[in-house]
């Protein structure tokens, strides 16, 4: 018997089929160091048994007729194409008339004709990580040998366009490219990207015993990684691009943050958890079946359990996860809750970790 999610919104769990394994070593990547949590496990790849178990349970837990699978990394394309073909076979096996959609995030460097044929044929949406023009992108996005990745990413994007694959850009805003908002924005228009997600990089330093350096909420430290964008930079970056976009590009180019802000303004669901009053509806499952509260909270204290010992419903509608979601608002300082702009930004104290005065509010 299927156990259904008790609320109307879909159960959403991001999959990490290779964990933190990646062919790049981007300086600011928050996920690379997660491999230290699994240093005793020799192979960081999702096996067929776990893949089938997750797909069956994930589909059977849904109340909606449309079901979205999201594949994330690490670098997702380090799993062979056969793995994703197998995933689609299993999705159809357990779909029982429901519509299945897939989206996949990639750094773009491993895309080939064969990959793009598959993505187009099966209508997969692709997210490509690219940080603007070459001089910005290559500053932090390099491979393990220190070589730049921009040229390979652009070759991948060319292939996506060649085969007509739908794709959007996930662009990290850091201490370097934040000072050039129009150059950054115009680059995406020049390469034909109409859907853009801007993500500010804000990482605090906390030295863990196992070698991890990034802090989570509750690990009180004001020290930031050097690549972190400042509040002033982030504010100027958004305002400058917004002025350009609202005067020239509305309806032609779509910027996720602006769409979400408008949704908040008119009382609609913003569609992204970072812009919601509460969160906790989007978890993540690692390559071995471990489940965490959020993709940005893969820390031991935010582990909900393992799919082999607990159901997805038990984990995501249990007290621990519900409290996690409510704390996004509860932990805000009074100054943020009383701010006239709160409705617009729904500041994400959970993500930045600045619980005394949120980082966003300073910009």
Language-model segment annotations:
Residues 22, 26-29, 273, 279, ...:
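Short cysteine clusters
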Residues 40-45, 139-147, 355-356:
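Short glycine-enriched, charge-decorated loop/helix-capping segments at active-site entrances
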Residues 13, 279-281:
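Short loop/turn microsegments at loop-to-beta-strand junctions
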Residues 298-363:
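Flexible mid-to-C-terminal extensions adjoining Fe-S/redox cofactors in radical SAM and related proteins
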Residues 1-117, 121-122:
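Conserved alpha-helical substructure of the radical SAM core
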Residues 55-56, 78-197, 204-206:
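Conserved AdoMet/S-adenosylmethionine-binding subsite of the radical SAM
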Residues 141-151, 158, 162-274, 278, ...:
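Radical SAM enzyme [4Fe-4S]-AdoMet core and its adjacent flexible, acidic
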């Amino acid at each position: 018997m299927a156990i259904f999610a008790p609320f109307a919104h879909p159960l959403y769990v991001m999959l990490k089929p290779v964990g933190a394994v990646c062919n790049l070593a981007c300086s600011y990547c928050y996920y690379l160091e997660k491999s230290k949590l699994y240093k005793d496990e020799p192979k960081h790849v999702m096996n067929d048994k776990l893949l089938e178990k997750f797909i069956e349970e994930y589909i059977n837990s849904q109340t909606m007729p449309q079901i979205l699978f999201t594949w994330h990394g690490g670098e997702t394309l380090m799993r062979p194409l056969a793995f994703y073909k197998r995933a689609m076979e299993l999705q159809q096996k357990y779909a029982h008339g429901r519509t299945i959609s897939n989206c996949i995030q990639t750094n773009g460097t491993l895309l080939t004709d064969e990959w793009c044929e598959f993505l187009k044929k099966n209508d997969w949406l692709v997210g490509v990580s690219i940080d603007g023009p070459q001089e910005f992108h290559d500053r932090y996005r390099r491979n393990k040998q220190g070589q730049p990745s921009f040229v390979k990413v652009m070759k991948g994007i060319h292939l996506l366009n060649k085969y007509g694959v739908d794709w959007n850009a996930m662009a990290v805003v850091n201490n370097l490219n934040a000072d050039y908002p129009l150059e950054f924005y115009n680059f995406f228009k020049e390469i034909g990207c109409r859907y853009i997600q801007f993500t500010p990089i804000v990482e605090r330093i906390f030295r863990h015993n196992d070698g991890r350096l990034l802090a989570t909420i509750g690990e009180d430290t004001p020290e930031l990684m050097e690549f972190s964008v400042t509040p002033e930079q982030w504010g100027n970056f958004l305002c400058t691009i917004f002025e350009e976009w609202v005067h020239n590009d509305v309806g032609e180019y779509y910027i996720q943050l602006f769409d979400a802000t408008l949704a908040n303004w008119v009382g609609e669901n913003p569609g992204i958890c970072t812009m919601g009053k509460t969160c906790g509806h989007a978890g993540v499952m690692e390559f071995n079946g471990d489940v965490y509260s959020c993709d940005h909270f893969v820390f031991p204290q935010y582990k909900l359990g393992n799919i082999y010992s607990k159901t997805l419903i038990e984990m995501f509608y249990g007290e621990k996860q519900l409290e996690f979601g409510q704390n996004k608002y509860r932990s805000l300082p009074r100054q943020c809750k009383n701010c006239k702009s709160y409705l617009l930004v729904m500041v994400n104290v959970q993500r930045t970790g600045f619980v005394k005065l949120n980082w966003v509010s300073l910009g």
